[in-house]
Each structure stands twice: as C-alpha cells, then as structure tokens.
Amino acid sequence: MSAAEIKTNTDQKMQKSLESLKSSLAKIRSGRANPGILEHIHVDYYGNPTPLSQVASLGLADARTINVQPFEKTMVAAVEKAIRDSDLGLNPASQGTVIRVPMPALTEERRRELTKVVKSEGEDTKIAVRNLRRDANEHLKRLTKDKEISEDEERRATDEIQKMTDKAVVDIDKIIVEKEKEIMTV
C-alpha cells in the first residue's frame, strides 16, 4: 500500500465517521419535527421486521408534526404500534389512513441533557478520527521502516493526514454547535 492509498483510505474513513455522526445526531429529538428520527423504526410487515420508510411515506405536517402515511391501509395499526413502542417516547394518533406524530416540546432540563449527549457523540467521533490518524501514521512508519517510501514522503503524508484530521475535527465541531443550537431553540 502506497502513501497515497493510505491518505485516500484515511480520508474516506474520516468522511464515514462524519456521516455516522450526522446520522446518529438525526435520531436525537430536538422538539422540531424531523422525519429522520423515525428511520430506524422497524414495522412488523407480514411477519418481517421492515424499516418504516419501506412501508409508509414520511412527511411534515407542520414544524412539530410528522405525517406517516402507510402504503397499505391494513398497516396503519402496525405502524402506529411500532412508533409508540419505539424508544423515542412519541405518541402517534391515527386519523384514517394518516398517522400524525406530534413532537412534544422539550423541557429546559431535557434540552441540557440532550446537549450533553450531542457533545458526547461529537467527542466519540473525534476520538475515532484521531484513531484513524494514528493508524495511518503507524502504517506510514511501517512503510518507511520497510524502505517502501522515503522519510520525506512519510513526513509529507503525515502532515497531510494531520491536516485531514484537523479539518475533520473542525467539521465535527460545526456539526455539534449546529445541533446544540437546534436543540436549545425553543
């Protein structure tokens, strides 16, 4: 594996870490309706656990309400039950073929707890990015030791990996600040 491949591989893994952070933060309720928080819910569809997005269309009715419209009328009860039984603490209400999921307002205390969770997620992602940097640097040192790349190449690649790490950390901080702001907005 060359230094360029190591850099490319590390960059891809860092981007995956950022995407993972974004998806995990999307599941954190902020008081504002976001269909993304229902994505991980599975519905019992004729005996098979199926993602909610495959059995119903998700949309926003207003800033605090998500509309869930099952593709089959017979699935309304199952979808409603799956949402109610999820760990999100939501209380869906069925209106014919449409299920309305109101997002309850968050208390100040709950908002503060959620910001702590967000910070923790961000810190975990930063640790993952730093571990990727460490692994890449170790790999580069091995290549230098085995005389596959020169010390200058190693130094250049290490500097570039450090720049990628710094950029990823800045991106993580931006994402965290944005989510905290979203949570704290009443």
From Swiss-Prot:
Matches recorded under SUPFAM superfamilies: Ribosome recycling factor, RRF
Gene Ontology MF terms: ribosomal large subunit binding
GO cellular component terms, semicolon-separated: cytosol
Keyword Amino-acid biosynthesis annotated: no
Pfam families: RRF
Keywords for the protein's UniProt record, in alphabetical order: Cytoplasm, Protein biosynthesis
Cellular localisation: Cytoplasm
Main location class: cytoplasm
Keyword GTP-binding attached: no
Biological process annotations from GO: cytoplasmic translational termination
Similarity comment: family membership: Belongs to the RRF family.
Known function: Responsible for the release of ribosomes from messenger RNA at the termination of protein biosynthesis. May increase the efficiency of translation by recycling ribosomes from one round of translation to another.
Name by which UniProt lists this protein: Ribosome-recycling factor
Gene: frr
